[in-house]
Amino acid sequence: MAAASDTAVLDALVEIQRAQDPTLAFRYACRVGMCGSCAMVVNGRERRACRTRLESRGPGPVSVRPLYHFPLLGDLVVDMTLFAARLQDVGAALTPGENAEPYARVSGLSAERREIDLAIECIGCGMCVSASTMVGHNERFPGAAALNRTLTLGLDHRDGEREARWRVLLATTRLHAATGRATARRSAR
């Protein structure tokens, strides 16, 4: 399909679905890069289709495929059930401690916040799992998103499960199994 170079990959897919193939299946929700629903592999790199412009992919045709390491449901739609289960397996929800404040009161200027800041940008899109070679080698490896979430919660002073989270994070079958044997295939940015 011919499209302007500043067209987002997602917009091109919507147009293809509208004009050429109404059965084409893909996910999207927010269309502004916040939710990660439209994550897919574009010209061999994990991308959010709503934030990826056709022009940024260079001249010529653009190839799209579903994320790697996920069961395929149809066309560009993958099953995220195992991804969500891996987050649950590592305890990816805050468990308030006995003296935890009822509302998050972590100052944006505090050292704790600066330590956590980089890790809280994860939107749970699955691109890191797709880009990981370790996921393909060890089915017990929870993936970068789950490890990132565990780390973030392990650094939060309000969490009553901090010690347990660190044990999970450092468990031989989780993190140690991945170190030194595999790396991300490429950046998922």
Predicted regions and their residues:
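Glycine-rich phosphate/adenylate-binding loop and adjacent beta-alpha elements
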Residues: 45-64
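A cross-kingdom feature strongest in bacterial/archaeal respiratory oxidoreductases
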Residues: 25-27
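Extracellular/mature segments of secreted proteins
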Residues: 38, 58-59, 186-188
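Short strand-turn-strand beta-turns centered on an Asx-Gly dipeptide
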Residues: 2, 41-45
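Structural beta-strand/beta-sheet cores of well-ordered domains, especially the beta-sheet scaffolds
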Residues: 36, 60-62, 118
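Short beta-strand scaffold segments in enzyme catalytic cores
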Residues: 39-40, 132
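Ferredoxin-type iron-sulfur electron-transfer modules in oxidoreductases and energy-metabolism complexes
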Residues: 6-22, 64-189
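Short, structured protein-protein interaction patches enriched in aromatics and acidic/basic residues
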Residues: 30-37
